[in-house]
Design a protein with these regions (language model features):
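Surface-exposed, interaction-prone regions used to assemble/regulate multi-protein complexes
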Residues: 1-125
Length: 125
């Protein structure tokens, strides 16, 4: 399975952009860590909400010499059951080189898969 298919409602991103993007040059607008009740549960769970301004860059060039962007939007991802996080160097413009996703075995139960998410930074993020 492609890792992005592990994300609930990934089809909304694909429908909007026509594909699953790399999120190259996307900007992290907001990152929120919270302990909250996950839908259908009374237990608290660590949750990370990520808001990215993203698009698909085309090969077409505007009159101003910039690449044309397709489907520019703010995408909200909610990651539930977060077990580990590492943050480095937050600044005024947190541009990504890519949003890397990888399916891995759950550390406590090898029969379950979990999603590893890396916000590959262009700068110190």
């Amino acid at each position: 399975m492609e890792a992005h298919r592990f994300i609930e409602d990934f089809e909304l991103v694909v429908a909007h952009l026509g594909m699953w993007p790399s999120f190259h040059d996307s900007e992290v607008l907001k990152l929120v860590l919270d302990r909250t009740h996950v839908a259908g549960s009374k237990e608290l769970s660590p949750v990370l909400d990520l808001h990215l301004r993203g698009w698909v860059m085309t090969s077409e060039v505007t009159e101003q010499g910039f690449y044309k962007l397709h489907g520019e939007a703010v995408f909200h991802f909610r990651f539930e059951g977060v077990s580990s996080i590492q943050l480095e160097g937050f600044n005024n413009q947190n541009v990504l080189s890519a949003l890397n996703l990888e399916l891995m075995s759950h550390p406590d139960d090898a029969s379950r898969q979990v999603l590893q998410v890396e916000l590959e930074h262009c700068y110190e993020f």
